[in-house]
Each structure stands twice: as structure tokens, then as C-alpha cells.
Amino acid sequence: MKRLIAAAACTTMILASVFACSSASAEHPPSAPKKKKAKSQPTPVVDPLQSLTYMRQGLVLMQQGQYDEALQRFQEADRIAPGNATNHNMMGLCYLRQGQFDQALEHFNQALELVPLFTDARNNRGATYLAMGQLHLAEVDFVAVLGDSTYPHAKQVNYNLGLTYLKRSQLGAAEESFRRAIVPPNPVFDAYLRLAEIAQRQGQLARAKVLLEEARINFPEMTQVSLELGKLLLLMGRTDEAAPYLQQVIADAPDSEYADTARNLLGAG
């Protein structure tokens, strides 16, 4: 399955620190009238900073893949301080990661109702539409995000837009978006794989090889690119050149699915 990049910034967003000052202290409490008052139900005291604490806890849990636990924290934060767009965006991300797309859309929509220019939420909503196969709506959101020249994660959005076009078999538009995603610095690894895929579909195997070699230079730690190079070289009939790449996959990640595939290709499975 082609992975979706739902803006890495969305999952690592720094929640703004809140500093509260109080003019009253334990040593000098505020004076109060001494006349007797009628008894009334005490009003629960809610610490507004507790909402931020829950959001931070939820973010950590979400980054650890504990989405149900993260949702509990975000929901508690929303109960204490409702109407926070960042909180709705985080809840939407949890649901997106769980494949619960309707719930994800609901929260991204709420985030955008609260803050219409919330670019992270719009990109995440686009990723949700893409996962649901609603390609036109996904394209609309991604194009809108790219219209924000201040957004620091445009490469990931270009990758998402490229996936949208690729699913429509619009190879030219997809290639253009993926090429924008690999512009240095910090190119998107998966964009290289998709570009190599397009080149192969067009019968341009030599160009696919160049793209994969560039990916391997930029991402030497990624086992998958060695596997893709080995597979491509086998397709080109260059068995002797393919073998070292496939052997490298097995050496780097012997217990992985990539290694199983490499062994099968080498005839050692």
C-alpha cells in the first residue's frame, strides 16, 4: 500500500506554552465581605492549564501509536476547554491512523470551522479524502495547502498531490508533483519510489535506475531502495549487478519481508 504522508508536522506539532500569573498568593489572600451568604452549590474549579497537559499527553501517546489512549486525552482536553482547533486536528489524526475516516473528517472539518486557514488540518483532510478514494476533494485540499507560501511542509503535500494524480493515471501531473517533492534539502523518500514506478510504466528503465540510485545516495539507511534496485536490475536482465543489492537487503534486515522477497529473487528462499 502506498503510504500517505499526512504532514509530518501534524504529528509533531509543538503546543504553545501557556504561562498563567495570579495576583493573589497564599500569604495575601483577597479580602472578602464578612456578611453571611445563602448556601449555594460550589462551582467546580477547572484549571485551564489541565487542558494543555492532556493535549501534550495525547501527543506523546499518538507518536507512540497508542491512538485509543491518545484520543481519551484529547477528548478530556476538549471537555475542559472546548473549541480548540489544534485539539480537533489531533483527534482527526488519531482516527485517520486507525482508518476511521468518517470520524477523522468530522474533526478536521471542526478544526477548519474554528480556524479556516489551519493548513495542517486542511492537508490532513486531503489525506483522508485520498484514503477514501475521493480524489477530486483531495486534490482541492492539497492545492489549497500549496497556495500557502509559508507552509514549511510543501514537499509532503506535493507527494500527497502526486499520489492523487497517480491514482487517476495522470502520470505527467503525478511526475511533476513528485519531482517537487524531491527538491533538496530534505526530499521525500517515497517520491523517488513513485517516480521510478512511473518511469518503469513508461518503459524508461534506465531513468528508473538513476532515480533509485539517487534515492540510495540520499537515504542509505532505507532497505527498500536496495530491494527496488535489485528487482529493477533483474528486470533489465542484469542478474550479476542485481545480486549484491539483494544480498545487502538480507544483510541489513534479515527478518523483514524485504529480505524474504530478496531471498526468493536470489533463489535462496
Regions found by a protein language model. Give the residues of each.
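Terminal, low-structured helical/coil segments at or just beyond the last alpha-helical repeat
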Residues: 28-45, 219, 223-269
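Structural signature of tandem alpha-helical TPR/SEL1-like repeats
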Residues: 65-73, 98-110, 132-144, 156, ...
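Alpha-helical segment of the N-proximal tetratricopeptide repeat
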Residues: 47-80, 97
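TPR alpha-solenoid repeat register
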Residues: 87, 121, 155-157, 191, ...
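Structural marker of alpha-solenoid helical repeat scaffolds
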Residues: 46, 80, 114, 148-150, ...
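Canonical tetratricopeptide repeat
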Residues: 56, 89-90, 97, 124, ...
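Residue-level recognition of tetratricopeptide repeat
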Residues: 50, 84, 118, 152-154, ...
